Amino acid sequence: MSEARRVAHANAGVCTAADLTAAGLTRRAIAAAVERRELERLRRGVFADPGVPPMIKQAVRVGGRLACVSAARLHGLRVLREPAELHVSVDAHATRLRHPDDRLRLLHPSGTSSGVRLHWTRGGGGRGPLVSLEECLVQMFSCLPGLDVLCALDAARERVDWMPERPQLLDDAAFARLLQRLSPAFRQLAHRSITGSQAVGETVARERLRATGVPVRAQVPLPGGYWADLLIGERLILDIEGEGPHTAPGAFDRDRARAGWLKAIGYAHVSFSHRQVLDDWESIDGVVRMLMRRRVHVWGDERSIGR
């Protein structure tokens, strides 16, 4: 790896001319690195490793940091809907912003005509080419519908008891700090997030059921060491397939074995695809309500000795 690329890597893929000269590179050496495509010039005095994600390059070219829902996936968050605009955090006093695809074109302060959504922030959202995880979430609260926010926040807080090797992106202390930055209404929304959701479909289904008064819990432990994606009432298991753990190698056979065991000890089980949850919720809602009218969600004579 060349010295120029090493400097870029040490700065999260994006560095300044000052970073490069501090490492001993002359102006001529910097120009040669650009010529050899070891570096890509984004703005005057700002360079990137060519392998940096395109959205980061665009945000830096604008004059800020990748922000909000545009930064969410790079932080490891789940996104309900892909953004139609490039979200960029810029300093409240920033001037001479540039077009995301052309460093020579000025950007109108609204940004909308160029497909950019500007987040004016004192300090521009921190250091590095994208805002911090906490700043990303704060921006999402003020910018996106509540369901979109919960999908991302569930992902940030996800803590899988049977997968301790998977790090929790936003631990309890960080969540408490996040709450302090939110308005009362947004704090109320944040408290609806959970640590057990493992997929967008689970979050969406949980919230849509909750909104209609259906008694639902997520990631509930079951007999035999199994878990329910969602448990309606006492015994109706609702699984969302095609996303999350249901797509892992061997998941099909494991899911069939699990379904057989749980049926044998008295649980009722229905499963729907991720696509159905997002695009055909009315059908799912109809099935759930018919089952609840039949009292399938509560224990009766089928209560098993495994309970």
Predicted features along the sequence, with ranges:
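Surface segments flanking catalytic/ligand-binding clefts of nucleic-acid enzymes
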Residues: 157-307
